[in-house]
Amino acid sequence: MSELTQLAQQEKKQTYNFNKLQKRLRRNVGNAIADFGMIEDGDKVMVCLSGGKDSYTLLDILLNLQQSAPIKFDIVAVNLDQKQPGFPEHVLPEYLESIGVDYKIVQENTYGIVKEKIPEGKTTCSLCSRLRRGILYRTATELGATKIALGHHRDDMLATLFLNMFYGGKIKSMPPKLISDDGKQIVIRPLAYCKEKDIEKYAIAKEFPIIPCNLCGSQPNLQRQVVKEMLNTWDRQYPGRLETMFSAMQNITLSHMCDPKLFDFKGIKHGQLIDGIEGDTAFDEERITPMQFEDEDQTDFSNKEMINFKEVN
């Protein structure tokens, strides 16, 4: 076999693998949008673009779905320039103009505020997050955006669940859709069903101009990084565990938790049968059927159906 033929076959295989990856991401995003009612007809979606792999992928997939969705919605990309030293201000405008999407660059010196308020070596995430949230909410109002799309994915949601359990004493994660405290903004996370490793592969293949974050990426031993490494270890040692855990987040039996605010334990009386509540049978050893997980390299995309988002080419 000639070298030219080998190169052609290799390129064909790479194209095939990329197409499978892209379709998997589009399907996962489409299903999340449909399952949680994230985007409706006439919406203006403000995609928050940080310059990282997640938000680039989010914008790219939403733009693709926009072309084939059965509903009409607008997209505007927004980047918050936090005035970090050395931040390449030209990168995002050049990229956004090259793909022809409406965008707005918001310039606020949150970097200076965080550095002034937080002692050296301490975690800046909490203050930085609050500052960014307020600015993005204000910007959404100014732009007339009806939805704010963030780039958090499945692995972020799982990490947040464990962070809250380990350090906050709560069973709480990132919701795929939420409303702000004042009821004026709806935040959505269309990548909720997407694996981080899929997003990483996609970002590399698309050659997105990634911009590192000096505020959080340079801080060692963050609690989130510790939890993330724990999840990555589980994923390597026990394939399918993360999928099972994420499935558990969608299958909660409140009567077998311990929160009296969510379930009326005091109201349980003798002779009472309540539909939908598992009693002592839930203590029986359950017959666990192994979950069927999608083989990333053997996925059949001949059926390109997506819930509410049909036929993406």
Swiss-Prot record:
InterPro entries attached to this UniProt entry: Rossmann-like_a/b/a_fold, TilS/TtcA_N, tRNA_Cyd_32_2_STrfase, tRNA_thiolation_TtcA_Ctu1
GO biological process terms, semicolon-separated: tRNA thio-modification
Domain of life per record: Bacteria
Enzyme class: transferase
Record flagged with keyword tRNA-binding: yes
CDD domains the UniProt entry points to: TtcA-like
Localization: Cytoplasm
Binding site for [4Fe-4S] cluster: 125, 128, 216
Keyword tRNA-binding attributed: yes
GO molecular function, one term: 4 iron, 4 sulfur cluster binding
Pathways per UniProt: tRNA modification
Extent of motif PP-loop motif: 50-55
Alphabetically ordered keywords of this record: 4Fe-4S, ATP-binding, Cytoplasm, Iron, Iron-sulfur, Magnesium, Metal-binding, Nucleotide-binding, RNA-binding, Transferase, tRNA processing, tRNA-binding
Family: Belongs to the TtcA family.
Role this protein plays: Catalyzes the ATP-dependent 2-thiolation of cytidine in position 32 of tRNA, to form 2-thiocytidine (s(2)C32). The sulfur atoms are provided by the cysteine/cysteine desulfurase (IscS) system.
Note: The thiolation reaction likely consists of two steps: a first activation step by ATP to form an adenylated intermediate of the target base of tRNA, and a second nucleophilic substitution step of the sulfur (S) atom supplied by the hydrosulfide attached to the Fe-S cluster.
Subunit relationships: Homodimer.
Name of this protein: tRNA-cytidine(32) 2-sulfurtransferase
Gene field: ttcA
